[in-house]
Swiss-Prot record:
Function: May be involved in a process influencing telomere capping.
Domain of life: Eukaryota
A cellular component annotation (GO) from this entry: nucleus
Keyword Nucleotide-binding: no
Keyword line: Cytoplasm, Nucleus
Keyword Metal-binding: no
A Pfam family reported for this protein in Swiss-Prot or TrEMBL: RTC4
Protein name from the UniProt record: Restriction of telomere capping protein 4
Amino acid sequence: MSNKGLKRKTYGKRSLNYSIKNSKLNLNQESSEHSSRSNTELSDDSASSFECEDRVQDDESYTNGISNQIINAFGVLEGSNLKVEEDSVSNGENEFITTTNSEEEKIADADDEQPLDEIEVVKLKDTKLHVKYGSHELKHLGLFDSILQKVPLKLHKRKKRTIIKEFTQRDFLIKKLEVRAKYNKEFKLPQVLYHDEIIEAIKPYMDIIIQLLKGKLQSVYYDSAKQAFLNSERAILSAHEFRALDLKKFQAGYYGLRRQLCVGEYIYDIYKEKICSLKSPTARWWGPRDFSSYVLAPELLISVCIEEMGLKDDPNYFDDNNEGSGESARSKAYSILQDTVKFGQIVADTDPMQPWEVLSEEKNIENLQLNVAKYSSRKWRIALPKET
């Protein structure tokens, strides 16, 4: 009977390979090395099983060694939420399976498709040890570097990436709340609008688009767009040049890029013919859609910002000689948008775009074992429309 390569079922992509070679053992060898066994001649299958058992015992010793190393690295487990969990290695609980390479690859591909959790569970290669922890927790305890030093170098790459990942889902929500509270305190920002709400908010100011297209309204965003065009040697904006742009100059601050792009698409749908017929080299270089999203949309949102935050021109904005010494409302709004880009990226862009998405958001927060009332975007809204 030929022996197939045996593989051990483990956590992660890679499985342990146990290649059984030269498994023919005679009675004398068996009795001398293992007196407890019967004097009956062992078959090839029995020999294979016996070799696997030896490897399991070695694996158990290695597991205990790694376990002690990690416990020493942590120094203190009591009083923290860190847990070291070890699967039992006892009679009948070690599973061995025979698989082909193609089956192993399928398992590996399926493992890669699984989303990362807020609490990472790492399977150390060649062991049955699992280390459960949150990276945010490790940093506060000053143990992040210690655990990395104890992780085997041959650890599966995907699992290693989960260890050094700076923010997990849970950590991000904590960071998001900090940013939201900080910017709301400093700037007293209005609530983050849903898709339909922001479209309704821009409708009264759509005439500004006509003024911009006719060049009757000065635009800081247009000036930045023109400068990008002048710095280019290409006839149109390439993907490489777009990635190299400092998009913070073209983002409408606390509204976030997702909502800004929705506004840009709305503008393009209404004024498509006018935008496509523009003779401006800057507009042609950007292209109609990007020009709508990164030049016209933020200018339109400046007008919405003025209304939401109650901004007004300074009394001395214009003097008798028509030379302003104060600041205009649009200038104030532009400054606020530039100062709140981080809020837009971290908070607005990750807040629900539709009312019904709030339920999904809160379910995710609950799964992460965080306070729903504290971390939900619902808390920061004045009046939440009915979720249908």
